[in-house]
Each structure stands twice: as structure tokens, then as C-alpha cells.
Amino acid sequence: MAIAERHLMSGLKLQRLGMLMEQEPGNAQEVEGVLNPAAARGPDGELYLFPRLVARGNYSRIGIARVRFNKAGDPAGVERLGIALEPEADYERRPDGGGGCEDPRITFVEPLQIYMMTYTAFSPEGPRIALALSKDLFHWKRLGLATFGPYHGVECGDVDDKDASVFPVAIPNPSGHPELAILHRPLFPGTRPEEIVRHPAARKVDLDRESIWISYCVMSLESRESNRFGRFMSHHRLATPVSPWERLKIGGGTPPILTRHGWLIVYHGVSEMEKPSVGEHQLRYSAGVMVLSKEHPQIIRYRSVEPVLTPTLPQECSGTVAHVVFPTRHRPARRSRPTQSLRRLLRDGRQPDWCRKA
């Protein structure tokens, strides 16, 4: 699990700081990997990680660890504190004894004054988005699976889904009513990268590649305690693969944070490796930046033409899954400020230096 931090100074820069958390020798809960963590700052002011811990047989739990900082103020290590969630609900377990609580994201939802975790529950039917709430980050109440209403005649209830995160404030839905908004990546049949990797161009079907969607549900203190909470009834396809580095699919990454330019997310895109070695994984996961309109997040103000992070280090080119960088949380630097280059790219759409390949 590597960390990278953005410094908004004379220009937006991305610097790798190193490995923050690795598999603990002798820990059976981590024998197959430690990856894809959520992060959140608790009521005590501490920063906590919620990594996916993978045991033998791809059995995944969500751990909790306190981040330790060095004298320079950079993350330097973690203190393991136990398990936040492990497969217990029916929708997290499979008949063969397997299961998983995977790839969490955590947002403090301000109108509800509560932390919301979105995670992938590896159910008997396949991966689904599950929700949980907490007041302190240590005690979590499951809300069950998120459900999605039909979209233009397409039934979404039985569609696999991943990479979910919610906005921290109410967002106008397509009708203009403020609701809880979630970013997610439905896996419609026939859209997986392995299925379309040899297709030279998009097919006629509108839902031909995995994309980032935004969906909405009623949000209030009353709805939180009812069975209406987590029922997302209106939808909008936010973004589809555009650039070569994301040709096969895109998916959500970090939960959205508000800047003066709009909602900032770091997302992932997948492309085919040009010259994969024999027996190697043929897909490459990279990261890009997207900025959404503050008032109308379904409007994209900017997105990366080139990736801002690609797998280059040995730990990124081999391991649990090869050739992958996968963003799940960003933490603004303490003295971060908007830059001229960011203002310029939002004004005229030009690609700044920090979005170009080295």
C-alpha cells in the first residue's frame, strides 16, 4: 500500500512518499495482500486507514489502523487496531465459505453528522455495493446493500457494482431536489475489460464500457432509519472512457472533496499493455483527475487527458495484481492552495505540466 501526496504550491505535483503499510509477517488475515484502503479523520483528530485485508482464498476483511506521522508531518507508518468489518451478513458470504468486505471508501456526511462507509460486498450473486454508518469510526452499523432503480428500461437491481463513494453534502438530483449522491461503477454484462480488450472501437450499445455513474436517494435524519435509505432511484452516467490510457474502462477512486474549482476526484482508468510479457497481466490501471461542477456535479469541468500516476515501481508492477495503481483516498496538504495552473486548465482546458507523462 503506497502513498502519494499532492502539494498545491507553484504547480500541482505528485510525489511518492513510500510504502505506508505492508503485509504483516505471520498474520493469516493478510497473507494474500493489504490494499485499497479508505481513510478518514476521526473525532479525536487522528487519521485512520481502513485497508482491505486479504486472507487465503481471497477472503477479505476491512481493517482499521492509526496513521503515524514523522517530524516532517508526512505519513510514515501505521498502528494496527483490529477489524472494522468482516464477512458476517448473508450478502457478504458465499456458500463455499468464502466472502468479502472489500475496497471501502469513507465520507463524513455533514447533514447527517455521521460517517458513511461504502464497500464492495462479495455476495453469492457477485460484487454489490454495501453501506455502513458510524459515529466514531470504530463501531459500524450495516445498512445492507444499496439498491438501484431502473434506468431507461435497463434493470439495475441485479447488476454487479463496485467503486462507490458518496458526497459529503446533499447534491441536486436531476429534478433539482437535494439528495444523497453516490458515485459508482455498474458492471453491465459484456462491459468487462477482458471481454472488450480486442474491440478496436466502441460498440453500438450505449452501455458498452464500464463507466462512472452518479445516483441519488432521499437523505434526511428520518430516512436514515427507514428502509428508503440506500434506495437510489435516479441516475446519470457521469463519465465514460475517452483517452487511450482509460480506453477499456474507468471507475471511481477517491471520495469527492470540495475545492474552489469544484468537486475533485482522483479516478482510475484501464488500458491494455502494449507489449505484455508472456504470462503477465495484460491490463494496466492508472490514475487521473476529474473536477466536477460545485452546483451541478453531473457537469465535468476538467478531466485528465493523460494519467497523473502510472504503475512504474516494482511494487506496482508485481504483487497481488500486477501493473496497478488504484486511488482510494486523498488528503490535502496542510498549507495547500489553488494554483495558477489549475485555474488555467479549468478556464481553457489546456493540459498543465503536472498532467503530462514524464
Q: Residue spans of the language-model regions?
A:
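Glycine-rich phosphate-binding loop
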Residues: 105
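Metal-dependent C-N hydrolase catalytic cores
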Residues: 102
